[in-house]
């Protein structure tokens, strides 16, 4: 794992903080005794079948389960919780547990706030599912946090790991839309820790922005050699977030237990699946994921208010910040309304996907009542091309036939260059295009590929 960190701090890191000692000593000593008790949250779809989660044996899973996150006090923020601080009021510890370790002042005052908590809560009410694939799949919602209380001049590393919630394997009952216990858990997967790629960094850098683990991927490949987190499908997991102080002392291994602090957010626990089981999870992921627009019937902002998920205003702002070509907000102005449909119309004003037969076909293909297969949420880092968004324009009253313009879709690179779509269509298959060069100021070149057909002769040599 250390080799994955390409940073000039790598040489000093070997003296500052022994990462292997952290994973072997700190995490194992996090809760050497006691179980990982998690009381079901309100509306938890698992609670009706499982009144509580009993700890599984550490010998079976090779995990040392952490204590549960204590319930926040009255008036306290429920979005920030430090679960690893001994003596913080957590339950489930036995009388033989180790004495509380006094945390280093560099980490003692650190607090963490979970971003997009409303969205996480909405998924948690339904029973969050995360796709795992052999190649690795990113999480959605992405685990993002805001950190407070760090020493601005000290160096910190940020890590994540995943621990089983219990020792059970689950199956989804479609007739009752609920999860049922299917038996004992499968053999434990190799435990791995994901390091944030910016680690280590100064506390000032971590605190000035939202920390996102968008590079983290989940896999079910036991032989994975890409550093992804390995999980068993149909098992429940709890993500844990760790803040590690890079101790400059040469004997920092002795202080491993006091140089880190762990945070657990119960609303982020999930079931690992290879395909979404709950259709409501599928619909919510499509509605709230900015990279899943291709699977929507229409723009979420055009949905009726009573059918719109409560987290969409938050996710629409997130989508606009991550995707510059997404729809701008509706503020009642005609200019914004025209901008929202900029990519759905060509220069002549013809609405794309406006044909009635096409709308009927799309409505059948994209009907929310049809079962949607898993893996629909492409979390690529690139921006999606607007022409490929299967979006129906509810404002279009009709459409004119394309006639001899069968290629009236704007080019993908025009959007990245900020240019308007070309008035001329793509060359027809009968026209040879190997000598084509774009001359925006040359009428002959512009008319060469017009709908009227190519000229009788064209000089391909230099002029």
UniProtKB/Swiss-Prot annotation:
Cross-referenced InterPro entries: p53-like_TF_DNA-bd_sf (IPR008967), T-box_DNA-bd (IPR046360), T-box_sf (IPR036960), TF_T-box (IPR001699), TF_T-box_CS (IPR018186)
SUPFAM superfamilies registered for this protein in UniProt: p53-like transcription factors
UniProt keyword Transcription regulation, yes or no: yes
Assembly description: Binds DNA as a dimer. Interacts with dscr6/ripply3.
DNA-binding region: 119-297
Highest taxon listed in the record's lineage: Eukaryota
Encoding gene (name): tbx1
Name of the protein in question: T-box transcription factor TBX1
